[in-house]
Structures are given as structure tokens and as C-alpha cells.
Amino acid sequence: MLIDKYGRVVDYLRISVTQRCNFRCRYCMPTTPFSWTPKENLLTFEELFLFVKVAIDEGVKKIRITGGEPLVRKDLDVFIKMISDYKPDIDLALTTNGFMLPHFAKRLKDAGLKRINMSLDTLNEQKAKFIAQKSVLHEVLAGFEAALDAGLKVKINTVALKGFNDDELVNLLEFAKFRNSQIRFIEYMENSHAKEDLKGLKSDEILKIISQKYNVTKDEKLPNAPASIYRLDDGYKFGIIDPHKHDFCESCNRIRLSAEGLLIPCLYFEDALSIKKAVANGDIVAASEILRQVLANKPKENKWALGAENETSSRAFYQTGG
């Protein structure tokens, strides 16, 4: 079992398999010219899988595949099957923008994937084009339906932005509700690599908008979950992720592995260690020791929760993994 110095059980591993993405979302990607980490510098699926086995054997019970956009990496379903075959009852999930799901949803399900979190910030084609910087909405919505048809559980992630989709929050909630999917509204997380003068809505502003149509009641927060849960009178539940609040970190159970092999204890801290050499050499003992070292580096709270309201991440989110 993995337990950090604050007594939190860490049983959730988020793995970024690529930095690359087929979107250029304004709140994620840099506005200035940048280059991807060369493919030859990324961990192979075999190297990633070696660390996955170490993590599972140490007590990890949940794995989420992220990017970039994970589906742009070739043979992702093969990697998912490797994990599923090793630990069939592992909680195995994927975060995606949904664009490529019409082609991959069934293959992912057959490989052992159980759940998908899908980004959907708007139901308006022009707004979607503005955020992603390409026409995407038709394919994204088709991907949502393809995932449901394949038998995957789908949760929607919506970044709530002032003057952009604040007039759509109720429509997005109803879109998810009528399709028996949960939606989570995410406060915009500032990072120094994506500056578009975007302003996020705070959790109380999101609740105020939804409460104009629905009676909203605070529900019990799920253990280790980052989202605060709210319930409508008909029983439908939705979430709000607010990383600025103190309790966002108090039960954090996750660590992150970047595509190039950096094991990261927290999205907003830079105390990462590389497992690249260990897994390239097939050194399970060294990989396990690095895992323990990173666990020891895991902070009690992120910088926002510590009071740094204007803090931004110095590492771009597409590099760390969503």
C-alpha cells in the first residue's frame, strides 16, 4: 500500500501517453510557438507497462490514460489491453476530447477500458471552433454517442468560462442528464503557457447560474474525489471541481506519470523524478524506489490552497497530462 507522509492512501495513477493533441484549446496550449517532445524521448508502451505493473503491485487500484489527446498515439488499445490482462478488475479510464471516438470506442471497450471522461465546453459550433481552433463539435458529439453505444460509461468535463459558456451551463447539464451521464464543471486552472485573457467562473458563480432554473442541494463528497457533488430535486447529481479550495487536496490519492517518464506528485508542484532509465533497464527495484521517493515529495496542498491565489503552473498542462 502506498501512503504519503500526511496519511493519504495513494492508489490512483494518471498516465500521459503523449503530449500531442489534435486540438489547440486556448486554455491548455501555448499561444507562442512551441515544439513537442520528440517521439524517441517518450516511454514505449512496454516501458510504461513495466511501471504500471510496479504501481499495481504496490497498491494502485485506478489508472487513467491521458494526453495531450491519448487517442492520437498509435495502438493505444493494445496498451490498454496489456493493463487489463494484467489486472482485469483495475478501474481503467481514459480522458479524451472525443474527436476520434467514433473510430476507437468499440476497440477501447473490447480492450478492457471501462470509463471515459470527455471534454465538452459548449454545444455551439462556433464557440467550439473558437476554443479548439478548428471545427470539431460534430465529431465530438458523434464520439460521445459512439462511446455510449460501445457500452462505456461517459462523464463530461466542462471548463466554465466567463463570457464564453456561462450562458450554456444549464444546457450542458441537461445534455448530460438526459443521456444518463454525469457532468463536472471545472474551474479554469491558470497556467503560464496558455494566456488568452480567459476568466474562469468560480464554484459559487456556477451554482448561482444553475440555481436560476433548478433547486440545488449540496451532496456528500465522494471519498478521494476532487469534485464537490450537488443534487437536483429529481436526484440527478453533478460535480464542480474547485482546485482553489482547501479541501481539494486533503484526500488527494493520485500521482502522475508524464509521457517522457517524469513521475509527478502534484499538478502544481515541480518535484518530479524520472523513471526513464529504470524502466529502460527493466529495473523493477529502482522503479519502485523512485515511486516511493515521489510519494515522499507529495505536498499537503497545492499552491492555491496554500494561499497563492495568482499562482500559475510553470509546466504546461499538455506536458503533464490532463
Curated annotation (Swiss-Prot):
Annotated catalysed reactions: GTP + AH2 + S-adenosyl-L-methionine = (8S)-3',8-cyclo-7,8-dihydroguanosine 5'-triphosphate + 5'-deoxyadenosine + L-methionine + A + H(+)
Keywords, ordered alphabetically: 4Fe-4S, GTP-binding, Iron, Iron-sulfur, Lyase, Metal-binding, Molybdenum cofactor biosynthesis, Nucleotide-binding, S-adenosyl-L-methionine
**Annotated Radical SAM core domain residues:** 5-226
The record's EC number reads: 4.1.99.22
Gene Ontology molecular function terms on file: 4 iron, 4 sulfur cluster binding; cyclic pyranopterin monophosphate synthase activity; GTP 3',8'-cyclase activity; GTP binding; metal ion binding; S-adenosyl-L-methionine binding
Give the enzyme class: lyase
Q: Which SMART domains match?
A: Elp3 (SM00729)
What InterPro entries does this protein map onto? Answer: Aldolase_TIM, Elp3/MiaA/NifB-like_rSAM, MoaA, MoaA_NifB_PqqE_Fe-S-bd_CS, MoaA_twitch, MoCo_biosynth_MoaA/MoaC, rSAM
The record lists GTP as bound by R14, R64, T95, K155, R254, I255, R256
Q: Which cofactor does it need?
A: [4Fe-4S] cluster
Q: Which PROSITE patterns match?
A: MOAA_NIFB_PQQE, RADICAL_SAM
Question: Pathway it acts in?
Answer: Cofactor biosynthesis; molybdopterin biosynthesis
Q: Which sites bind S-adenosyl-L-methionine?
A: Y27, G68, S119, M189
Q: How is the cofactor bound?
A: Binds 2 [4Fe-4S] clusters. Binds 1 [4Fe-4S] cluster coordinated with 3 cysteines and an exchangeable S-adenosyl-L-methionine and 1 [4Fe-4S] cluster coordinated with 3 cysteines and the GTP-derived substrate.
Q: Which family does it belong to?
A: Belongs to the radical SAM superfamily. MoaA family.
Q: Which HAMAP family match?
A: MoaA_B (MF_01225_B)
Give a short account of what the protein does.
Answer: Catalyzes the cyclization of GTP to (8S)-3',8-cyclo-7,8-dihydroguanosine 5'-triphosphate.
Record protein name field: GTP 3',8-cyclase
Q: Which organism is it from?
A: Campylobacter concisus (strain 13826)
